[in-house]
Structures are given as structure tokens and as C-alpha cells.
Design a protein with these regions (language model features):
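Conserved ATPase-coupling elements of RecA-like P-loop NTPase cores
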Residues: 143-153
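Alpha-helical scaffold elements adjacent to nucleotide-binding pockets in ATP/GTP-utilizing enzyme cores
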Residues: 31, 35, 39-47, 88-100, ...
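Mid-core helix/loop region of P-loop NTP-binding domains shared across ATPases and GTPases
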Residues: 100-136, 140, 155-157
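P-loop NTPase motor core
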Residues: 58-99
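Single conserved hydrophobic/aromatic residue that forms the stacking wall/gate
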Residues: 162-171
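Walker A/P-loop-proximal flanking segment of P-loop NTPase domains
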Residues: 1-35, 39-48, 52-62
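Short loop/turn elements that form and flank the Walker-type P-loop nucleotide-binding site
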Residues: 22-23, 68-69, 127-130
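Residues immediately C-terminal
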Residues: 141-144, 169
Length: 171
């Protein structure tokens, strides 16, 4: 909406966004750097959080009839890319999850016997089906950051896979 508000060039691809948003599926977009992934994610965020409010005058306005407002969490993994050990990465990832999911009702209890990831997965189970949209940007940032550091790369990859597997059935 800011692009259009300031008369910047904006190519309306919201008809394609409608096609994707109309299906209850998980999508993984791999595109080159500077290829519009963040703008695409922001458009989805606006659609699922506010409906058509910020998309008036675009193709999607005449197509999208769903008036449901969703809980929307946007995770930007570039916020967790500076670390020197697997433990530090795990802490940064946990902080990213707590910070972003607390905006939609997740409450982490520090000092509890249960880990952050366990508490988070238990909280996810309490949500109504199809009530949460999770958008991930810069998913590869932590891995790119530690390229060339074989052991650290493997540990970060495993942590990301474990976290995504734990959440996969719940989201």
C-alpha cells in the first residue's frame, strides 16, 4: 500500500495472490535476491490481517470474498542471523518466536521445565483450525550467515528442521 500511496510503480499481481490465498495450503517460495519475496509476503500479511482494506483498486478486490481476519505472524529470519554457536542461534530463534508469536497471544513462561519450543507447540494446539497464518521472510539468512562453517551450518540446519517439523502439523 505504501508503494501505491506514494505513486511508485506497482505491478498488480493480486489475481495470482488470490489464487494462492484461496487454497488452504503451505507454500514455499524460492526466488533470487531482490526478486520481490518481501513485497509478496507483505501483501499476504495485509490480505490476511486486514482483508481488502489496503488492496482497494487492485484485481483481488473483485475476487476475494473471504472476510475472515486471521492471526498473522511474520517471522523475519534475518533478525536471527548473527551468532557464533548453535546454542546462541537457538536462543535467537527462540527470541524471534517469542517476540512475534506473543503479538497474537503466545505467552512464554521462562524458567519453566518445558522448553520454549515445547510451550510454543502446546500453544499452537490450542488455536482454532485455520486461524493462524505464518509468513516467513529471509528463511535462509541464518544458513547463509554460517556458510563455510560446516559444523555450525549443520547444527543450524538441524535446529531449523526440528523447529519446522515440530510446527508443521500444527500450523
Amino acid at each position: 500500500s505504501a508503494l501505491r500511496q506514494f505513486d511508485e510503480i506497482y505491478v498488480d499481481k493480486t489475481e495470482l495472490i488470490y489464487d494462492l490465498a484461496s487454497q488452504k495450503s503451505k507454500y514455499f517460495f524460492v526466488r533470487p535476491r531482490r526478486f520481490g519475496k518481501s513485497l509478496l509476503i507483505s501483501t499476504f500479511e495485509s490480505l490476511f490481517k486486514y482483508g481488502l482494506k489496503e488492496l482497494r483498486g487492485l484485481a483481488i478486490e473483485g475476487l476475494y470474498k473471504n472476510e475472515t481476519k486471521y492471526l498473522v505472524v511474520k517471522l523475519d529470519f534475518s533478525e536471527a542471523k548473527y551468532f557464533s554457536s548453535p546454542e546462541e542461534f537457538s536462543e535467537r530463534l527462540a527470541s524471534l518466536i517469542v517476540r512475534n508469536f506473543s503479538r497474537v497471544g503466545f505467552s512464554y513462561v521462562p524458567g519453566s521445565a518445558e522448553s520454549i519450543f515445547y510451550q510454543w507447540s502446546e500453544w499452537l494446539k490450542t488455536l482454532d483450525s485455520n486461524s493462524l497464518v505464518v509468513l516467513v521472510d529471509e528463511y535462509d539468512s541464518p544458513l547463509t550467515y554460517c556458510l563455510g562453517q560446516e559444523e555450525l551450518f549443520a547444527a543450524v540446519r538441524d535446529c531449523l528442521l526440528y523447529t519446522s517439523d515440530a510446527a508443521d502439523d500444527l500450523i
